[in-house]
Regions:
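N-terminal pre-domain/capping segments
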Residues: 1-100, 120-121, 138, 153
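Active-site acidic/histidine proton-transfer and metal-coordination neighborhood
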Residues: 78-167
């Protein structure tokens, strides 16, 4: 049977260690066995402490995120793509280190409204970045979950057909 989960933002803004720990405690106390955290920057949070608390409370962790324009792996700019690949690598490692099993969200482009269609080069850059990240995630025991979103959140994957074609 699948576990029922809840996003940490229901309980807290997710900006502090104490807030995330409180979200874990409240989730467990109300019967949830899975919590979704927004992107965890390793330099900001004590991932070992969060992992221990989650384990003690028997709550699984999933992490979701969207890339900023400065780290858009669907960009035509190699430096921006590289920044995105580095951010995704860091995110996979953070999910692994916190004992999580899933990294999801808008991992394939920036989380923003675009005013142009994606370029062929940008799409290929995104596919290559996700393939590279998938290899790292597989080795780390982390599933990647690509969130297909509406056109106001990304220009690359807006339909199930586009998502299936992408993978």
């Amino acid at each position: 049977m699948r576990k029922l989960g809840i996003h940490s933002f229901v309980w807290t803004g997710g900006q502090t260690q104490a807030g995330l720990e409180e979200a874990l405690e409240k989730s467990a106390a109300t019967g949830y066995r899975l919590i979704e955290f927004a992107y965890l920057r390793p330099e900001k949070f004590d991932l070992d402490r969060l992992a221990k608390k989650a384990q003690d409370l028997d709550v699984e962790i999933a992490v979701t995120m969207g890339l900023p324009l400065s780290a858009d792996v669907s960009s035509d700019d190699p430096a921006v793509v590289k920044a995105g690949e580095e951010m995704l690598t860091s995110a996979v490692k953070a999910v692994r280190d916190i004992g999580g099993g899933k990294l999801g969200g808008i991992l394939y482009s920036a989380h923003t409204k675009y005013f142009t269609q994606p370029t062929d080069r940008g799409r290929k850059n995104s596919i290559a970045a996700i393939a590279k990240t998938a290899d790292l995630a597989k080795a780390a025991g982390v599933d990647l979950v690509l969130e297909i979103v509406n056109r106001f959140e990304s220009n690359l994957l807006n339909t199930t057909a586009q998502g299936l074609d992408f993978i």
